[in-house]
Amino acid sequence: MSWHEQDYGFGTSSENSKINSDEFEDSMDVTEFNNPGEESTYPQANSWNDSNKTKDIAEYYDYSWSGQREANQQIPQPVPVQPRYPDEQNFSMNGETYPSEAYDYDYSGQEEAINAMNILQGNLERSNEYYSEGVPYSEEDLGAYAGGMTEDDQMYSNFNETGEFNLDIGSSKFSYLNAKNPYPAWIAENSIPITAENILEIFQELQAKFGFQYDSMLNMYDFFMVLLDSRSSRMDAENALKSLHADYIGGRNANYRKWYFSSSMDIDDSVGLQNCKFSSNGPKIKQAKKKQKRKSNKAETEGTNEPETSVQIDPLNVSMENWENEMKNLDCETQVRQLALYLLCWGEANNIRFCPECLCFIFKLANDFMQSEDYAKSEPIEDDCFYLDNVITPLYEFIRDQQFELLDGKLVRRERDHAQIIGYDDINQLFWYPEGIARIVTVDGTQLITLPKWERFHKLSEVDWKKAFYKTFYESRSWFHLVTNFNRIWVIHFTTYWYYTVFNSPTIIEKNFRQSVGPKPIPSCHWTSVSLGGAVATLLMLLATIFEWIHVPRKFPGSRPLLKRFLILILFFILNVAPTVFVFGFSTEEQQRTTGRLTVAIVHFIFSVFTFIYFSLVPLNNLFHRAYKSSSRTHLANRYFTADYARLQINDMCVSWGLWLLVFGAKFTESYFFLSLSFRDPILVLSTMKPYLCNITFLGSHLCIWQPKILLGIMYVTDLVLFFLDTYLWYILVNTVFSVARSFFLGISIWTPWRNIFARMPKRIYSKILCTPEVDSSYKPKVLVSQIWNSIIISLYREHLLAIEHVQRLIYHQVNSLDGDGSKTLKTPTFFVSQEDSSFNTEYFPAHSEAERRLSFFAQSLATPIPEPIPVDAMPTFTVLVPHYGEKILLSLKEIIREQDKLSRVTLLEYLKQLHANEWKCFVRDTKILAEEDALSNQDLNSQDESMKAEQLHKKFDDLPFYCIGFKNATPEYTLRTRIWASLRSQTLYRTVSGFMNYSRAIKLLYRVENPDVAQLFEGQMDVLEYELDRMASRKFKMCVSMQRYAKFTADEIENTEFILRAYPDLLIAYLDEDPPKEGETTPQLYAALIDGYSELDENKKRKPKYRIKLSGNPILGDGKSDNQNLSLPFYRGEYIQLIDANQDNYLEECLKIRSILAEFEAFDLKTNDPYAETNALYQNNPVAIMGAREYIFSENIGILGDVAAGKEQTFGTLFARTMAQIGGKLHYGHPDFLNAIYMTTRGGVSKAQKGLHVNEDIYAGMTALQRGGRIKHCEYYQCGKGRDLGFGSILNFTTKIGTGMGEQMVSREYYYLGTQLPFDRFLSFYYAHPGFHINNIFIMLSVQLFMVVLVNLGGMYHVVTVCDYDHDQKLTVPMRPEGCYQLNPVVNWLKRCIISIFIVFFISFVPLTVQELTERGAWRALTRLGKHFASFSPMFEVFACQTYAQSVIANLSFGGARYIGTGRGFATARLSFSLLFSRFAGPSIYLGSRTLLMLLFGTMTVWIPHLIYFWISTLAMCISPFIFNPHQFSWTDFFVDYREFIRWLSRGNSRSHINSWIGYCRLTRTRITGYKRRLLGVPVSKGVIDTSRAHFTNMFFTEIFIPLMLVPLTLVSYFFIDSQPGNPDPSKVTNPILRILILAFLPIIVAAVVSMTFAGMACMMGPLLDLCCKKFGAVLAALAHGITVFMFIIVFEVSWYLEAWCLAKTVLSMLCIIAIQRFFFKIIQVLFLTRELKHDGTNLAWWTGKWYSRGLGFHALSQPSRELICKMTELNFFAADFFLCHLLLFLMLPVLLIPFIDRWHSMMLFWLKPSKQIRPPIYSMRQNRLRKKIVQRYGTMFFLLLIAFLALIIIPLVVAKDLLANFEMDILRTYGLMQPRDTNWTENGTNWTTVNE
């Protein structure tokens, strides 16, 4: 068998052993050194009072103390560590050179990597050519101290002499290899099976033969060698190579191996796919159509015809066995060749890296060619872009052209939705099955599989890919996806609800119900009705199957056969319905009461329950078929790539099932008693209620008698929604309990019994941070621990988190021994015992400070089980990957000390000083010392008296400038320090880079501490020691920032980037480089480039890239972030990747745990295991793909909004992730997770990138890992810092992004595969942790709306009928009193329970955060934080956020438009205008809230219960939350200045264009439905306009037409009933509410149409003439038209009130009906009759000015006037509604505005700042103050006049209602029934009528 049956694999390892946290040597208590040489080796424990010794030690540790001396006390540093501030070095900014003392006064003096270093005998400069990760010396330099080196180092120094790396490749890029071996583990002494030189020759050969790019080859060679070095550092070299080959190619978990068999490549290699026919069970050999010809004439004459041999296909298990045998026999060179070829194919694949199986196919063809004789004969290809241009580019262009067209060198998006785009997944899935590969044909029609294997690779350039690819899944925007994907959720809830509700609805079944007897249904009828739940379940499964038919094309080989399932489901449906039909339809009442019919009903119920359980438990794709055999080829690709779920361990499985059994056990119990059983009485009274004597014109009593049934129907639906909400409620509670229990189990709660975390910290540092087995036992543990602890404390000090006094109390001191023999001993800080002893009153750090938090978490985390670390030199290499686009790199001085805009009241520096007061004090203190030192060194004071010196200095250095801006002398070195301080406390890239470069510091620290012999070896040679530490750190850790825009950075951005590169020269920066277009071309040539701090500068002062790899085109085809990550993937190094965002932080103490974190991947136990050995079980387990980690949101406690955002991240990222990871429900959410790099990059990368569909790119990597067999774990003992949005708008932007992204996920194929294939418990975990959250939000808001509809319909009855007396304890069989009454009190009680349910669902969102705080920080902190949230109106924000989540998902499924929203990184201190907030949030929430508020007002006026107060708060929150959380919203002057801006916003934009105007907002809102006009072919999209396509009618139908339509009858029936005068025996008093409401609803529309046409005619006739003298003619005309509609709004309200006989409740209901009718009418017009919007507002301007001729309309001039008339008709009505709504919102805020000092209290609520630390008011000039006072006077008067007018419209009619009604009665109104009589309750006096059958 050929090697082609090999593929990529991934191996796993056995469980890592955990360290007993309390294991520690008794010698920790020893206070003396007993080892010779310790004192010189670790001289860190000097006395703090010995200044001379301190100086020596500072020099020893290469530590700069300039600016740090205070009272002759300095801090000893055990190990030199890189500071977060730049090193002591000279560097250039703004063309000036700054000395290191300017800013690095207190930081380590590690030499800049590219500057000279002193090594023993003098200055040795780094080589001009060097290796990227810091091999800085030439061999001659190293030879100077070879005598003091180890054997390995001596071998390196003679590297050229051995010839091992004596490479002649014609490039200076390899000169760094001559300096020193950058891969120390891959050396001859380690018995390597193949030398690095030979490996390079293989890479060069493949590059020449296949036409790979030279730089790409160099990059991939280094990539491969780093992998080999990483693996071989912890296992023998041969197994290191084999394990890599197993991970990539041939192992059991290798993706290539799985693809190889799923696509039947083994059959292609043996018999050829061209000889097979395809079926769902795999390829079959074709039957020969004719006999084979004789072989030759010679054979015929000799009679030696050979017998025909039958060709057969080996079974799958046989093929796999052959594969494994082949893998075992591969020699090392072949393994290297295969790995090299794959990596070279992958490295240049560009966007095709998102298609892993496509890459497998390309690699297979390339390998077939490599294995052939033609390969050996082939000549090198001169074009080094041959592979890119002929293989990758055609595929790239197909992908690009699906979404974009290229116009003038720019990509312009096509108007296609996902269902019409053949995306990455569709392309990739073509290669899953042999049927797909068989579709690949060349341009001449030849099938690729018919060609010889070795010719196929070179034929790829001739393939017609358009004929090959097709949609394999339709991601259409439809709610039908939810039916299919989550069918089991619907089955569980709908069926159970049916059982519960029908069982408690006996009156629905009983024919002859009598109230005095009560419900007595026939048992057989009752049970068979309940049993119809099985039919409900079957019907849901039928719908799911039908919709699957729609979404999955039948021609896709991976589609499941649905006809068989459909027919069996129909049979199930018949079996579940037939007994009911038999009992009800074919049985008399006497027969129904027989035992036989009851038996049928019971059997029916049993079968129904069986159906329900079966459909609930079994995934949709597994229905009605047996499990596949392991040897079966049936749907092998689906099993490998979509359903290869890792099995849970037995304990985790028990936890998973236990959690869901508890959830549903509690849910079913509570739902039955609280929801269903309590619903029994309302069902009974409403289902039997018969209204009497109710009539209206046209309909008589035909409608009103059905009012109770209609109300009951709405209540059924509402109860069903609440039934769904209960499940999520119990999920939150039970999940929280399980998470807390696990936190106790892991020991991470402060309530755990072993609370002495600080006392045991030294022991745990020794046992869990240090790799103690590798440490020489002669070294005392205390010595080692002191170095770690002192380094942590010093890092806190350098970051200005601790004052020098705190440091003195916290670190280990070296003191004289008590024995008096002159020896030294270490004094342990009292901190470790003081935390457990209340008698200590010493302050070790500021209370509730960042230092306290970090040290507490570090101590707490060490109490948890942590994998045992391995030696530093054996740890795997890993990379931190940071995507960067436009985030701030380093704050400029202007950004820090000046307000960002005119709306901001505070500078960033002032705000940061208030947030970090103690840290600012430490910073100022250090700055002053630095300034004093500079002053002393710059002036001659020898002739002055000492006292005069001190006095002069004191006068000179006044404290005020330092405390204000951080410096007094505005020289660059001082301003830079302030910039750095602010940047390290903001969300900047500098903070991220400096934080995560702590990994380098941690590795050097651990390596030195654990290897004291290294320090002894280089004793007195600190430069050499530092070099050795740098070499180890750069070998094990890389950090790569993917700066997509680097080549187009501004000068400031370039300067800031250079600053970071000089501070951290090992930092890698990948970016998108560009060459101008060649002659005759319009498209620039793009490259992926890499630089670091060692890259040379060209003549333009730009860094020369180390690698520059040509791309097929613009790689940014998606939403940006995922493409940016993919761009940098070839430049990562090592075995693992940590994905980080550019607003995160990390800390030294957390970085010390890196070895334990990497050990969680269970890949450290591979030392002697051959991955291809039969006995190796490590590679048979599912590999760990993703390792999740905690996040600390450092924006918490700085205001309510930042704290809410932080709390959500904490609960989701920690509390729930803890449980979800254990039960297999956790996915990947981006930061700060660690990824198994080989596993993920061979399966599509670290994210997905189709534009729009994958807007939440990170989570798809998690779903891919879950589907393909990877395990996802969670780490409790490690956390990173994370920034979060702080403003209302930015938080809601993030919410919108997540919501729209979830809408995209719901239509994706990943959700389809997971929803229809996951096992039951795993499915529930996935659903409720991800889509369930958003669906629950939709259900919450739906329940509120349904509740309001119930309230409106109940209020319509409650207002005009007599309600019966009701005693909750007595039965409903008691006669109702008074006579003729309506028994509505059970319905009111049901309302109360509904409100309680909805309240609990909202309140439950606070439980996880409270519990999280309670377990990790204690009861007081939990209560304090919760109290702050409630005092700051956090519940109102939660309501608004819930609505935003729900609206985002709904809008995305209706209109699409999901895009990456860059969330805010700054501090929200600026006041936003009312108009801006209204236009942003009106559509998502304010309009809905106002309609809900009107419903609630009617309900309150008719059915008052105290429970409604909660709904008043909630609905008000939906309307006014944006303004409540707007900084300084209630500042008196700003309020009226803003009101002026609001009036202007309403009025402008009608005579000339204005971006910020009401008409612009209205047009933008409308384009969501209509879209913009299609651009002409070849014409680019207009600037400033987002190209929005028209939404599809079917997508919009549900939300834009169906729901508004349903609200019309649901409100009208209540209105008709309230005006039907129930109980009135006089038929002559019947009114006509139908005609009345139609007139009132359409009168404003007609008036608006007439006004629009009239004014448009006036504009056409007079506009061009008057415009010569009256420039604002159009604006005046528009203002008159809008004013008329506002007046009409008032008329409609007052007339409606008059016609309702001045009954305010009925008037409110009539306004509800008018709004519902108009809303539906306008929706119909917009959806059906409005064409697309023009991309300019020319038609609007032409309408009011009459200038149609100059608008550039072209042929549109014929159709636009009629279209604009429709628009104006809707706009005028919308304007009137917005005018009144906005003023009502402003009037609601007025009482708050009048509260004294409200701005101060409001700021305290938002920012949690004490009154003494409030943000100062802005400073205005005298002219500005005068202007603002005039504005307040003018517009304040206008505001209050309008308020008086509004109040008058309400108060006057109320006062004079009786007189008005008596004096203004009109007979014509009575004649047509338009006038409603005064309210009279005709049922209250008792009649002979009754509402029930007694």
Swiss-Prot record:
Reactions listed under catalytic activity: [(1->3)-beta-D-glucosyl](n) + UDP-alpha-D-glucose = [(1->3)-beta-D-glucosyl](n+1) + UDP + H(+)
Sample GO molecular function, one term: 1,3-beta-D-glucan synthase activity
Keyword Transmembrane helix: yes
UniProt membrane topology term: Multi-pass membrane protein
Pfam families: FKS1_dom1, FKS1_dom2, Glucan_synthase
Disordered: annotated span: 1-53, 282-310
Induction remark: By sporulation.
Biased composition (Basic residues): 286-296
BP GO annotations: (1->3)-beta-D-glucan biosynthetic process; ascospore wall (1->3)-beta-D-glucan biosynthetic process; fungal-type cell wall polysaccharide biosynthetic process
Segments traversing the membrane: 530-550, 566-586, 600-620, 655-675, 710-730, 731-751, 1338-1358, 1394-1414, 1476-1498, 1503-1525, 1598-1618, 1637-1657, 1673-1693, 1697-1717, 1778-1798, 1837-1857
SMART domains: FKS1_dom1
Glycosyltransferase recorded as keyword: yes
Polar residues bias spans: 32-51
Keywords: Glycosyltransferase, Meiosis, Membrane, Sporulation, Transferase, Transmembrane, Transmembrane helix
Origin superkingdom: Eukaryota
GO cellular component entries: 1,3-beta-D-glucan synthase complex; plasma membrane; prospore membrane
Family of this protein: Belongs to the glycosyltransferase 48 family.
Subunit structure of this chain's protein: Component of the 1,3-beta-glucan synthase (GS) complex, composed of at least the alternate catalytic subunits bgs1, bgs2, bgs3, and bgs4, and a regulatory subunit chr4.
Protein name: 1,3-beta-glucan synthase component bgs2
